């Protein structure tokens, strides 16, 4: 299911539940992905600088961990992560899943991410429906 209702435990369906669970897509990101992310951010900081004036929360992993081992993370439209949207869509289609839920956060959006997301939507809008969270609930 693309989403379901629950009351206390998101793993227990409750058709009358007050809360809605919407599973976010996830996939593996290799160390090479993070090397590219860090290098491109250093080579062209204006393009990869977050647009907002906020700061994202510190993650649990160190840069060393990101650069040396794969990580299973959510599919995101933020910054350089947006370069993986086509791969996420292929993975979703191969799994015969009708939904690809992508997240983004205003504190992490960049000019690069906006352009990549815009290209992704332009490339796929004829064959896929793009919706917002508010239109699903």
Language-model region placement:
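Conserved, mostly hydrophobic/aromatic
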Residues: 22, 102, 132
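Extended, basic/helix-rich recognition subdomains
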Residues: 63-64, 76-124
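Non-catalytic interaction surface on structured domains
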Residues: 126-128
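His/Asp/Glu-enriched short active-site or ligand-binding loop at hydrolase and phosphoryl-transfer sites
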Residues: 1-3, 130-135
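Active-site beta-loop-alpha junctions enriched in small/polar residues
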Residues: 25-29, 105-109, 135-136
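Active-site-adjacent pocket scaffolds in enzyme catalytic domains
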Residues: 1-93
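Generic alpha-helix signal with a bias toward terminal, lower-confidence helices
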Residues: 34-36, 114, 136
